[in-house]
Structures are given as structure tokens and as C-alpha cells.
Amino acid sequence: MSKFQVVEHPLIQHKLSILRRKEASTKEFRELVDEIGMLMAYEVSRDLPLEDVEIETPVQKTTVKQIAGKKLAIVPILRAGIGMVDGILKLIPAARVGHIGMYRDEETLKPVEYLVKLPADIADRQIFLVDPMLATGGSAILAVDSLKKRNAKAENIKFVCLVAAPEGVKALQEAHPDIEIYTAALDEKLNEHGYIVPGLGDAGDRLFGTK
């Protein structure tokens, strides 16, 4: 299986088309990021291992399938990544939530890390690292660096975004060829300011109504 996947589910593509529109309000944008995050989680979790468990229904005892004991952590890259968390938690409410805080230096376009707060047992968890955008790839690379420094296993890390630029995908794959990348759309390119084209604008500003 390829370590890069564009999730082409019709509901995801439909909601993404509405999310991209410049006239979408902050409320609409926030709700759509939440919904797409939930749908992406459904697709990304397809390969979670199952185990047989014996239960008792009102009629009789039986053997059923349930997700095996592996624990999950959702780790948003702040601030925009926080918009995807609630949608995923609706599907996987027992997941722990960590945070990696970064901002982009507007002159160098390089990410600056200011916060890392993770579950103590992050090394034993499956990790959904989430950020709506994969632009230059700098923030994602630094975030994966931070996870690996804290003994997270590469095979347990899945980077999940809504829109990606080819440049960002290439950079992340070159820096961390051992993690999986999922996106709802692979866009055309980055512009001279480091923004994805056609993209959806600044996801953080659109989520929180800031400039």
C-alpha cells in the first residue's frame, strides 16, 4: 500500500468544494472542517486491527469483532489543526489529545515550535497528526521530528490533512519516508508566498475569524 493517499470519498469531496469557497462564513468553515475531519478519520482508520471478543446479547453469547487494544492519540498542529479534533473524537471518543504548537515566520516561511504537550505513553499509541494544510511541509516535518524524539514509532504515525501541495508532500516524504500521509485533495502548487493554489486560504484565520 502506498504511503500517500488522496481520499476521494464523494462526501469528503463535496464538503471540501464548499469549504474552499471564499464566501463561506467562519461558522460554516468551522463546521465543515469538523465534518471532513470525521469523514477522513473513518477512511484513515480502515486498517486498525480487529480482535475477537465474546459478549452476551439479550438472546445468547456470541463472538464479535472490536478494535484491538492499540490506543490512539490525536495530535493537532496548532492552531488550525485544532479544528479537526472534535470530528475525529466523535468517531473515536476514547482517543487522547496532544498538542504541537507552531507558527510560521512570514519572512522565512519556516515553522517555529513553541509548544509540545503529548500523552505520557505516546510511544505506545497510534497517532493521527492533523493539520488542515500541507503547504511547504515545514510544520509537518518539525512535528514528526518532535514525535519521534519522544519515541513515537514511525509506523504508528499518520499525517492527515484536507489540502496538500505537491511541494509539501515531496518534502514530508523525503524527510520522513516511513510515515503515512492522507489528504482530501492534492492541489496544483505553492505560490510565491508559500500558500497552496487554489487552496482554501489561511485555514487558521478562517476557522477562528481572525486576520
From Swiss-Prot:
Residues binding uracil: 196, 201-203
GO molecular function terms noted in the UniProt entry: GTP binding; magnesium ion binding; uracil phosphoribosyltransferase activity
CDD domains: PRTases_typeI
Protein keywords: Allosteric enzyme, Glycosyltransferase, GTP-binding, Magnesium, Nucleotide-binding, Transferase
Names of required cofactors: Mg(2+)
Keyword Mitochondrion: no
Reactions the enzyme catalyzes: UMP + diphosphate = 5-phospho-alpha-D-ribose 1-diphosphate + uracil
Enzyme class of the recorded protein, top EC level: transferase
Single GO biological process annotation from the record: UMP salvage
Cofactor note: Binds 1 Mg(2+) ion per subunit. The magnesium is bound as Mg-PRPP.
Listed pathway(s): Pyrimidine metabolism; UMP biosynthesis via salvage pathway; UMP from uracil: step 1/1
Residues annotated for 5-phospho-alpha-D-ribose 1-diphosphate binding in this entry: 79, 104, 131-139, 202
InterPro entries from the UniProt entry: PRibTrfase_dom, PRTase-like, Upp_B, UPRTase/APRTase, Ura_phspho_trans
EC number: 2.4.2.9
Pfam families named among the record's database cross-references: UPRTase
NCBIfam families associated with the record: PRK00129.1, upp
Family: Belongs to the UPRTase family.
Protein's job: Catalyzes the conversion of uracil and 5-phospho-alpha-D-ribose 1-diphosphate (PRPP) to UMP and diphosphate.
Protein name: Uracil phosphoribosyltransferase
Annotated organism of origin: Lactococcus lactis subsp. cremoris (strain MG1363)
